[in-house]
Design a protein with these regions (language model features):
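C-terminal alpha-helical "lid/dimerization" subdomain adjacent to the S-adenosyl-L-methionine
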Residues: 23, 169-223, 233
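Conserved alpha-helix/loop element of class I SAM-dependent methyltransferases that forms part
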Residues: 45-63
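Class I SAM-dependent methyltransferase SAM/SAH-binding core
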Residues: 66-123
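A short acidic, Gly/Pro-enriched loop at the edge of an enzyme's catalytic core
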Residues: 122-134
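A short SAM/SAH-binding and catalytic strip from SAM-dependent methyltransferases
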Residues: 133-146
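A short glycine-rich, Lys/Arg-flanked "PGG" loop and its adjoining helix->strand segment in the class I
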Residues: 146-158
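Conserved beta-strand signature within the Rossmann-like core of class I S-adenosyl-L-methionine
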Residues: 160-167
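Core SAM-dependent methyltransferase catalytic element
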Residues: 228-254
Length: 254
């Protein structure tokens, strides 16, 4: 499949998926919120918690830092961060009230407090230079990601760190084809197991299509640099099926 250049990839993605992003995803996540984490664990053949640990191992923290978790979902990352450093002030932003309700209950059950914000993450309701650390995981395929990287850069303090993890497009064509075949099978099976709604079932092809015109680990590194980040580093896992990135906002404008 011939892909558009990085310069116009975001335009192609938005033209193809804007309706799904603005309307259909909310309905799907409303339905799957109670078993979102279990579904991911099943679909990943038990690797989901390992994926989370790989991501967490990249994140550097200091006591009492202010952290923003973008597309926080059920607060898996926020909770893991507080287990590591209980003095953190964590804000979780997500557009799904249902996912955040589950996440808030999980955090409170463990004795943690996470500040929940329900909003469209494309326009972060925070001032410039506000957070020491920002995380974004397993949601980039559903976002205008170049714009999102710029918005995250805006709310980061100079010298602050951004950490990203998501399913990405493998750079090896053979691995890519096998990956999509596996995803079709596992997404259908997981939907049956957890009795997903028609809205969730209808999005199975979208999840594949979104990956087919998404970015490889290497391309996402370039995109981060284009959005003004420095010290960009990346880790490709399972031949690039999963990618983790870390980047820093420069201390001063060049």
């Amino acid at each position: 499949m011939a892909l558009p250049s990085l310069a116009i990839r975001e335009q192609v993605r938005e033209a193809a998926f804007s309706l799904v992003w603005s309307e259909q995803l909310n309905d799907a996540f409303k339905n799957i919120a109670p078993y979102y984490d279990r579904g991911n664990q099943v679909a990943s053949l038990g690797c989901w918690n390992w994926f989370l640990r790989c991501f967490m191992s990249m994140i550097e923290l200091q006591p009492k830092q202010r952290v923003l978790d973008v597309c926080a979902g059920t607060n898996a990352v926020g909770i893991a961060l507080l287990k590591r450093e209980p003095t953190l002030e964590i804000f979780a932003i997500d557009r799904s009230t249902d996912m955040q309700d589950v996440g808030r209950q999980r955090a409170e059950h463990l004795g943690f407090h996470i500040n929940s914000v329900i909003a469209d993450v494309h326009s972060l309701p925070f001032p410039d230079n506000h957070f020491d650390v920002v995380t974004l995981q397993f949601a980039s395929r559903h976002l205008k990601i170049a714009h999102m990287f710029g918005e995250i850069n805006r709310v980061l303090k100079p010298g602050g760190h951004f950490y990203h993890c998501d399913m990405l497009r493998p750079s090896n064509p053979v691995v890519e084809k096998l990956y999509y075949a596996y995803l079709r099978l596992c997404l259908s099976g997981t939907g049956l197991l957890f009795r997903s709604s028609p809205a969730a079932y209808n999005l199975i092809q979208y999840f594949i299509s979104a990956l087919e015109i998404f970015y490889t680990t290497e391309e996402l590194s370039i995109l981060l640099e284009e959005q003004g980040y420095c010290e960009v580093s990346a880790k490709a896992i399972f031949s690039g099926m999963l990618g983790c990135h870390s980047a820093r906002k420069p201390l001063a404008e060049a």
